């Protein structure tokens, strides 16, 4: 299971800066002003050979009022959700009463905790960090999150014991990047056969009360999951095995993600992490959206996490019955406007309560899974790559044309295509998007994103200085003397 790392600490110690560096985004607000992170932020990270979910929290300083009190509650809830806690402090400001209070709470929770002294750049770090040993949480790790110093080593140190205990194996190349293996034809065929024989793990996700449990009950034909007309009645992810027409499934019913103003943390403090872990554990994700409420920011957040995880996707617009045509037209227009960038995913309009359109979901779910796990040979991938070059040549880089040599499968679910060539790291994003769409159209991939990885081929001329022949040197001297004569 993918580990969860929570960043906890008082305001303005650098939690959001570290979050952005780990997730390589700017999802959390970052400015030198306390209290900007109003809520937990969730991101997917890969560093030091480990994949993990990172949770950025609002700060705690012991003087909270109003919204700050809620921020403190969110931070405490994040501690409960986490497998590993990074307790962040400010080495420049020194230890405060809030640090002591947080440390006392962490000791009482018996969580795997690492004390991180941030902002050690430009100061005598050893002297500044000495007082944090008195927090009683073990060794103090020095870091400068804004510059990235110490971040990789910290994650490596924090997650290695967890990975060893859970049997997680990491693979890194010499540059510390995740390894994409090159499958032989026999290995690719064996991997596809293995995946085809496994049950399809289907995570049904969405906000509370959009009809996820009703949809599962409709699929199963019985009241297997308790349903009340109250958001959040499903408090934990439930795994339900089933079969249909000879195909095995495992349905994952998740607790919904609700707006924080409506969260009862006692009831649903695990819901977000359970949902995100279910996405990581699934083969296909069915995102359920309420037609009456339209597309909310929470829907887009779940959609973004699903795409970042590389999971196959089907979208169900629920509660489609009983709304007039004008509302239906407005919803379809909003879907085109806000979800047009995921044109590979099938969208279904259903009524989980009455069963309308539910039967058609299976076809799209199986189609998405088959696309995500389909074997494509190296020769076919290389041929498609060459066709894309013939139709639209790669751009020039420093006066030289980018050369793509060959492509092979680097993984399944999601399908990964690894492309080898010269100067491929310098390809603009626009050309990479063109190639990704070209592969999707050529291979008829539906319901799953395709990931392209580019590997640089060794350049045998790199580092060599060009040495002129005797004749070239003579002609160069004549040309230079001619230029000097003209300038006199």
Swiss-Prot record:
The residues listed in the UniProt record as binding GTP 1, with positions renumbered to this chain, are 9-16, 56-60, 118-121
Keywords per UniProt: GTP-binding, Nucleotide-binding, Repeat, Ribosome biogenesis
Residues annotated as coiled-coil are none
What InterPro entries does the record tag this protein with? G_ENGA (IPR031166), GTP-bd (IPR006073), GTPase_Der (IPR016484), KH_dom-like (IPR032859), KH_dom-like_a/b (IPR015946), P-loop_NTPase (IPR027417), Small_GTP-bd (IPR005225)
Q: List the Pfam families hit by this protein, alphabetically.
A: KH_dom-like, MMR_HSR1
GO terms (molecular function) for this protein are:
GTP binding; ribosome binding
Q: Name one GO biological process term.
A: ribosome biogenesis
Residue intervals of the KH-like domain: 374-458
Where along the chain is GTP 2 bound? Answer: 206-213, 253-257, 318-321
Q: Where is the EngA-type G domain?
A: 3-166, 200-373
Which PANTHER family does the record cross-reference, listed alphabetically? GTPASE DER
Query: What family classification does the UniProt entry report for this protein?
Result: Belongs to the TRAFAC class TrmE-Era-EngA-EngB-Septin-like GTPase superfamily. EngA (Der) GTPase family.
Question: What is known about its subunit structure?
Answer: Associates with the 50S ribosomal subunit.
The function of this protein is:
GTPase that plays an essential role in the late steps of ribosome biogenesis.
The protein, known as? GTPase Der
- Origin organism is Shewanella frigidimarina (strain NCIMB 400)
Recite the lineage of the species: Bacteria, Pseudomonadati, Pseudomonadota, Gammaproteobacteria, Alteromonadales
């Amino acid at each position: 299971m993918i580990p969860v790392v929570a960043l906890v600490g008082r305001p303005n110690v650098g939690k959001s800066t570290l979050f952005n560096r780990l997730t390589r985004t700017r999802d959390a607000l970052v400015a030198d002003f306390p209290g900007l992170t109003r809520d937990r932020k969730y991101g997917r990270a890969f560093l030091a050979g480990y994949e993990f979910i990172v949770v950025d929290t609002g700060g705690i300083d012991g003087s909270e009022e109003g919204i700050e009190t809620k921020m403190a509650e969110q931070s405490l809830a994040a501690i409960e959700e986490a497998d590993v806690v990074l307790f962040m402090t400010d080495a420049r400001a020194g230890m405060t009463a809030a640090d002591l209070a947080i440390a006392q709470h962490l000791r009482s929770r018996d969580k795997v905790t690492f004390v991180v002294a941030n902002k050690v750049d430009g100061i005598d770090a050893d002297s500044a960090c000495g007082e944090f040993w008195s927090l009683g949480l073990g060794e103090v790790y020095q870091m400068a999150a804004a510059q990235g110093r110490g971040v990789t080593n910290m994650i490596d140190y924090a997650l290695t014991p967890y990975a060893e205990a859970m049997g997680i194996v990491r693979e890194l190349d010499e540059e510390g990047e995740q390894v994409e293996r090159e499958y032989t034809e026999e290995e690719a065929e064996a991997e596809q056969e293995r995946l085809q024989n496994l049950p399809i793990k289907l995570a049904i996700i969405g906000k509370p009360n959009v009809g996820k449990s009703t949809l599962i009950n409709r699929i199963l034909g019985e009241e297997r999951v308790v349903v009340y007309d109250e958001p959040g009645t499903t408090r934990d992810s439930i795994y339900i095995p089933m079969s249909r027409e000879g195909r095995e499934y495992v349905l994952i019913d998740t607790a919904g993600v609700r707006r924080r103003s409506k969260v009862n943390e006692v009831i649903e403090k695990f819901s977000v992490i359970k949902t995100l872990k279910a996405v990581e554990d699934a083969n296909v994700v069915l995102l359920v959206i309420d037609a009456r409420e339209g597309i909310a920011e929470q829907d887009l957040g779940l959609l973004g996490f699903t795409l970042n995880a590389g999971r196959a996707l089907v979208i169900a617009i629920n509660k489609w019955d009983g709304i007039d045509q004008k509302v239906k037209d407005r919803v379809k227009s909003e879907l085109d406007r806000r979800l047009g960038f995921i044109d590979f995913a099938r969208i279904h309009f259903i009524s989980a309560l009455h069963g309308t359109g539910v039967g058609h979901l299976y076809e799209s779910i199986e189609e998405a899974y088959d696309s995500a796990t389909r074997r494509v040979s190296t020769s076919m991938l290389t041929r498609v790559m060459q066709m894309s070059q013939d139709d639209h040549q790669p751009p020039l880089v420093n006066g030289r044309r980018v050369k793509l040599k060959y492509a092979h499968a680097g993984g399944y679910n999601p399908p990964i295509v690894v492309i080898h060539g010269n100067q491929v790291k310098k390809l603009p994003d626009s050309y990479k998007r063109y190639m990704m769409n070209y592969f999707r159209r050529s291979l008829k991939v539906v319901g799953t994103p395709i990931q392209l990885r580019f590997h640089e081929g060794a350049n045998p001329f790199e580092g060599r200085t060009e040495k002129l022949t005797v004749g070239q040197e003579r002609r160069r001297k004549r040309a230079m003397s001619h230029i000097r004569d003209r300038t006199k």
